[in-house]
A protein has these predicted regions:
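Conserved alpha-helical "signature site"
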Residues: 1-145, 151-159, 183-185, 190-245
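Cytosolic terminal low-complexity segments enriched in Ser/Thr and acidic residues
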Residues: 247-250, 256
Length: 280
């Protein structure tokens, strides 16, 4: 993948904003503590960054996690979500805040795009919280970043005056992955896998992203998360998410997962489909 990637795009990755110091401190502590991680120490590191602490509490009380009572302390957040998920959430949130967003090169309305990105994360939570809360907690940060590649690609295309050519090619081909590979040497989902690896995200998250298009080929440990993201990717595809074709493809993926020994509740998925998909 990286061998085919546009060289200028690779260079632009080198100057992406660094992650906050708090994330570096958390990572360093977890790495040094190994299995002897203390909740109080993690809370102490997070509490040294009031903005991050406030955002974590806000996210913990959002619909993403569906807790029935209000979460009021960082210790509660750490106990309920686990240190690994906390680090993923903090990283995902700080990354999202670092980018100027203009997705006009894709022919998309930026406000609608942002709304859909939030709906993706909410969908993962609503769909999986009842049947696999652990998987839901793992995938919410990933869903928050699922379209980050589109944001970075858009900025790159605009800066290099290729945005109009890209959109013309996209409109003509009606094939998003083809257009991205033609102009950038990689599609936005594969590029996200590359970025998560570069930022040292959790290995399971990285692998889940890398197998979104081929979940059946993922190793057993990540197969269920890869299928969950693949289903979400179909339902919220940037240009034709929730179309009759994509809604049927999402259900077909769930049935395919069953042949791989991965069980999702079909009725639960059907009841949690986005409204547009239900209409179809």
């Amino acid at each position: 993948m990286i061998g085919d990637m546009n060289e200028l795009l690779l260079k632009s990755v080198e100057v992406l904003p660094p992650l906050p110091d708090t994330v570096s401190k958390l990572r360093k502590y977890v790495s040094e503590a190994n299995s002897n991680i203390e909740t109080m120490k993690v809370a102490e590191i997070i509490s040294s960054d009031p903005l991050m602490m406030a955002k974590l509490l806000q996210l913990a009380n959002s619909p993403y996690y569906g807790f029935t009572r209000e979460i009021t302390t960082i210790n509660q957040v750490i106990t309920l979500l686990g240190v690994g998920n906390i680090i993923n959430i903090v990283m995902a949130d700080s990354i999202r805040d670092n980018f100027k967003i203009d997705v006009s090169p894709y022919g998309l309305n930026t406000q609608n795009f942002l709304k859909t990105c939030n709906e993706e994360a909410t969908f993962i939570a609503n769909w999986l919280n009842d049947e696999d809360k652990k998987l839901s907690h793992l995938l919410v940060p990933c869903a928050m970043l699922l379209r980050l590649g589109i944001v970075i690609f858009s900025n790159f295309l605009i800066q290099n005056h290729k945005d109009k050519d890209f959109l013309a090619f996209l409109n003509k081909s009606e094939n998003l992955a083809l257009a991205e590979n033609e102009f950038l040497g990689v599609d936005h989902i594969s590029f996200l896998g590359f970025l998560l690896h570069r930022w040292n995200f959790d290995d399971v998250l990285i692998e889940s992203i890398c197998f979104v298009r081929t979940p059946h080929a993922a190793r057993e440990k990540v197969k269920k998360s890869a299928y969950a993201l693949a289903i979400t990717d179909h339902l919220f595809a940037p240009h034709d998410g929730s179309s009759p074709f994509n809604a049927k493809a999402a259900v077909a993926l769930l049935k395919e997962a069953k042949t791989q020994g991965i069980n999702f509740d079909l009725n639960n998925l059907l009841s949690k489909l986005p409204n547009k998909a239900k209409e179809n």
